[in-house]
UniProtKB/Swiss-Prot annotation:
Keyword terms: Signal
InterPro entries, sorted: NorD/CobT (IPR051928), VWF_A (IPR002035), vWFA_dom_sf (IPR036465)
Basic and acidic residues: bias regions: 247-256, 273-284, 301-310, 329-342
Signal peptide (from-to): 1-31
Sequence segments annotated as region (Disordered): 247-285, 301-354
SMART domains linked to this entry: VWA
Name of the protein in question: Uncharacterized protein YojO
Keyword Signal assigned: yes
Keyword Signal in record: yes
Residue ranges occupied by any VWFA domain in the UniProt entry: 445-632
A Pfam family hit: VWA
Protein encoded by which gene: yojO
Length: 638
């Protein structure tokens, strides 16, 4: 069970999502992702921008500026670089140079400085970000220069001095004295560095590095010890042949996110219909026959390799290669021409977030309650009986008060015909209300309970709080469901992640007098995929007609599942935001058996915002839940 960590620090998920959106916007590609790494660079094959951990442990403003500068350099700046020259440079250093690390870092430093100037010309609003970046780097390299000189690490010291010279405000600033043979090279080095700000292409930067290395190969005795800038060893020649940020073949998005309710089994009736290749949505004619875009409809269960997007070179009369063979009776299972069925993931794809692409739900029905569970439930219900009665009385009094409220002479409502009071009274009451207030609470609740293994020492008291919710909501006739969720660790694979949902109290039976003992069936299980569970409950609640919808998540705040550790907090935060956009209020109840650390509180607030309730002593859970439930029910009455 882990929080997402950024070099042993908890990540601000809102900042991470902001940087992700920034990268996607600047690259104009949904395929691009961002991730934290040791050094900053762009991987064109993964379509991933890596941001350096160098910016950690700084003031929030400085950290944000540093991370943004990495995103600017890799998303906007990479377009100014030539990947062909990157490939040529890597080939040259492996064949001719001795000090490869120094050459690669020098190349990336000079190229970053060049593309930084290009970005500032294209987007002047980035100047303050790069100014902060330069200030932080100059402080860092000042310390590193002193340290390297004291330890006689002259290659690293020379690199730090080169950075200082390149970013100096005054042209009079010179390279410091190091070693006699290096000092003799100082005029030559400074002369070459003057060419950097005149370079307008990657090729010219490469030429400067080659000229510098020709001279420095004779005076340097060791390669660099530290890594300040990073050039990954990738197949840049191949990367240059494909789109830089976009996917090579990208299917158009549907106008609505609809999934077919039933998968096809191959026995459906097939109706042949003519479909014209031109229609009113066609913007421009094309030379290709039978080429069109589908923008409306539902997602099918076709295999991902069963079709491809058409190319302009495709022709209507192209030949098709197939094969046939004699079969026994009607057994066609061994025909070579038929494509063998591939193992397809059971998940719903990207509809539930990219981190849950291969997750799929398994809903469990509650078992009939045993005598032990019924006895345990009665004991729990007795402990919260006073809370439940107080809530019921409060709700009944509030509803009765609304009924007896005057329906005329109000400050808001329908305008009556007694308008003279507008001129004769200082605070006139000119409105009335026609309809009678409803005697029912127009609200619905879902209680989502984390059943991961980390809840083993909190589950008993959690059940007690859930019993309070259930009895209170049942007494005032508010429909609700109680669902425990977990992921099966043993059966989870890279392309199949079963997630179990144990609906111990469904909506349809939540108000029955005998409902409740099934709550005792909630037990700590294995892992938890919080973001996926919230999305599944959101779908179910959207089918409800009640005006107020509340989703209460009981957890210990540690989302962790197969392949979910790195981005679990970000995915959960995205799921919460999506639910709130659809009118569902999501509230987290954080459970603990000890004092809650500030880092834990920050992490929970990153996921759920200000709608987080912290319970440092789980034994006091009913005392915490009572005012919450009171407030939510009072809000539902309006």
């Amino acid at each position: 069970m882990k929080f997402i960590k950024f070099n042993d620090s908890t990540i601000d998920s809102f900042l991470f999502m902001m940087l992700t959106d920034l990268a996607k916007t600047l690259t104009k590609s949904e395929a691009v992702e961002v991730e934290y790494g040791v050094q900053s660079y762009y991987n064109p094959f993964e379509k991933k921008i890596y941001m350096s951990h160098f910016w950690k442990d700084r003031a929030a403003e400085d950290m944000e500026a540093g991370l943004k500068s990495d995103v600017y350099l890799r998303s906007v700046g990479t377009r100014y670089s030539s990947l062909h020259e990157f490939a040529n440079f890597l080939n040259d250093i492996h064949r001719h140079l001795t000090f490869k690390s120094f050459a690669k870092q020098l190349f990336m430093l000079l190229e970053d400085i060049r593309i930084e100037e290009c970005i500032k010309r294209e987007r002047p609003g980035t100047k303050h970000v790069f100014a902060k970046r330069k200030d932080m780097y100059r402080k860092h390299f000042s310390t590193q220069l002193t340290l390297n000189l004291e330890r006689s690490i002259f290659t690293d010291a020379l690199f730090c001095a080169i950075y200082f010279k390149l970013t100096a405000e005054s042209p009079l600033e010179t390279l410091p004295s190091m070693r006699e043979d290096i000092d003799l090279m100082r005029p030559f080095i400074e002369q070459q560095l003057l060419r950097v700000y005149e370079a307008d292409s990657t090729r010219q930067v490469l030429k400067i590095v080659e000229d510098l290395m020709d001279g420095l190969e004779e005076v340097l005795d060791k390669d660099m010890l530290n890594t300040y800038f990073f050039l990954p060893e990738l197949d840049y020649a191949k990367a240059a042949e494909q789109p830089l940020f976009e996917e090579e073949k990208k299917a158009p998005k549907l106008s609505d996110d609809i999934t077919l309710p039933k998968q096809s089994d191959g026995d459906e009736d097939i109706h042949e219909e003519e479909m014209p290749t031109w229609h009113r949505e066609t913007e421009a004619p094309s030379k290709s026959f039978l080429q069109f875009d589908i923008e409306h409809g539902a997602k099918s269960d076709l295999g991902k390799d069963a079709s491809r997007e058409g190319d302009d070179g495709d022709q209507a009369l192209g030949s098709v290669q197939g094969s046939a063979r004699q079969t026994k009776r009607k057994d066609y299972s061994k025909l070579e021409a038929l494509e063998s069925q591939k193992d397809q993931p059971n998940g719903a794809g990207m509809a539930d977030g990219k981190e849950n692409k291969y997750a799929f739900p398994i809903y469990k029905e509650p078992q009939p309650a045993t005598s032990e569970e019924e006895l345990s439930y009665k004991q729990q219900a007795k402990t919260i009986e006073s809370y439940q009665k107080r809530l019921k009385q409060m709700i009944q009094k509030t509803l009765e008060h609304k009924k007896t409220l005057p329906r005329t002479d109000l400050h808001a409502g329908r305008l009556n015909n007694k308008l003279l009071r507008y001129f004769t009274e200082r605070n006139p009451r000119l409105f009335y209300k026609k309809q009678e207030p409803s005697s029912e609470i127009d609200a619905v609740f879902t209680l989502l309970v984390d059943c991961s293994a980390s809840m083993f020492d909190k589950m008993d008291e959690t059940k007690r709080g859930i019993v309070l919710f259930h009895e209170a909501l049942k007494s005032v006739a508010v429909p609700h469901q109680i669902v425990g969720f977990w992921e099966d660790t043993n059966d989870a694979t890279e392309k199949s992640q079963p997630n179990y949902f144990n609906t111990v109290i469904p909506f349809q039976s939540s108000l029955r007098q005998d409902s409740g003992p099934a709550i005792m069936q909630l037990e700590p299980e294995e892992d938890n995929r919080d973001g996926y569970a919230i999305r599944q409950m959101t779908k179910k609640m959207l089918h409800r007609s009640e005006a107020q919808k509340f989703l209460i998540v009981f957890s210990d705040g540690e989302p962790a599942a197969f392949g979910y550790e790195q981005n679990g907090i970000v995915d959960t935060s995205e799921a919460v935001i999506e639910a709130r956009k659809r009118g569902i209020e999501v509230i987290n109840v954080f459970l603990s058996n000890s004092e809650i650390e500030e880092s834990q509180m920050k992490t929970i607030q990153d996921m759920y915002g200000k709608f987080s309730i912290f319970v440092p002593d789980v034994d006091q859970l009913p005392d915490v839940l009572y005012p919450l439930l009171k407030k939510l029910l009072h809000k539902s009455i309006g």
